[in-house]
């Protein structure tokens, strides 16, 4: 079972009584056929539920009102099978607070050249019914997604499925609770921000709990639970000699297991699905949570270090969006560069907390080594390299008057040399279009040093995320040129200033 099983998407057909009962009967029949086919063959993440035809303002408004109050409804897919006068949709769309996708399709793929008549034309009017619907969306300044293509086309299936992921993630975000253990790293700017504005814009709440509250739960974990989790570690990872049963760091592994069990219990009891820690506030914990955080991220929790609640929330959102897709998604940080003409590289990592979902190794190494930051005992961590291939890094920043999502398309590559003295998980990548352009654009746009790294999601997914939440997006990819990028930032400043 996945999070998508908790939701459904309503399929709404727009028409009108002008065409008579027989035409409406055929419209309903077509809709039933299309919905059944999409549910059985399109591999959509959510079930489509066909609703009664929308043929009058009252019917349409009732559907939209019901959608708002149904917690299982993640959004609406609308198909204008015939012409549906768009003034009928005004009241419904004005109150709708769920995501909306217009499926611009028709029942037949090919025109029946020899038999086409006006009855056929009146029945299959998506071509101009869809345009009428599009006008009212533009007139009401309500942005919605549009997918054009025949309902049997696999590309259309893929695009609808991607939108469904966004719709479900938006509903999950409205319920998301972010727990901050301690505060931000002192004097750091980008990890701070307006939590009230974030809750108004996205729906997630951010609150702080004392590390002492967590420590109480951690200290309540019994040896039996710790032993069971250690057995799981033994079967899932390659333990270094120091961490094996008679190793001199075995107790550190047991303490890491205690912290993991305590953190998970605390998060479950509080209904949290994202959290932050900071190495400056660890009072009562024997080590910085490393292994615990890595494993919790792999289970779907959002996380970021140093109190960075925006990145923690973004990671949870992207984890939901990517559920069931190939490739992983992780907290990440641009750590250091490799400058080589024509082969500039970025080495990404963090002190400990990189999610194993992006690991190339089937069984990462579990080790305990010294960590100079934090002043605690040596922490346990998983060490691995990252899968290669196309990926993205994304940063959500608070500009005071709005949020900006910054996305850099990257290509992860194999590490050309072993890293025998690097005791943390890492990812190595080439930034698009090149490191100088990408880094300068990122800096000019105010992108954070913390990011969410993903092989599972792509730029199109993040564009949809920005659209569905109505926030600015700045993209750095192979098409980026700095003069145009700077102009776009200036234009966005004017646009969003006027939009306020």
Swiss-Prot record:
Top-level EC class: isomerase
Cofactor comment in the record? Binds 1 Mn(2+) ion per subunit.
- Show the GO cellular component annotation of the record: cytosol
Query: What GO terms are given for molecular function?
Result: L-arabinose isomerase activity; manganese ion binding
The protein's matches in CDD domains, at most eight in alphabetical order, are given as: L-arabinose_isomerase
Say if the entry is tagged with keyword DNA repair.
Answer: no
This enzyme catalyses:
beta-L-arabinopyranose = L-ribulose
Q: What is its EC number?
A: 5.3.1.4
Please describe what this protein does.
Catalyzes the conversion of L-arabinose to L-ribulose.
Protein name, please? L-arabinose isomerase
Phylogenetic placement of the source organism: Bacteria, Pseudomonadati, Pseudomonadota, Gammaproteobacteria, Enterobacterales
Gene this chain is encoded by? araA
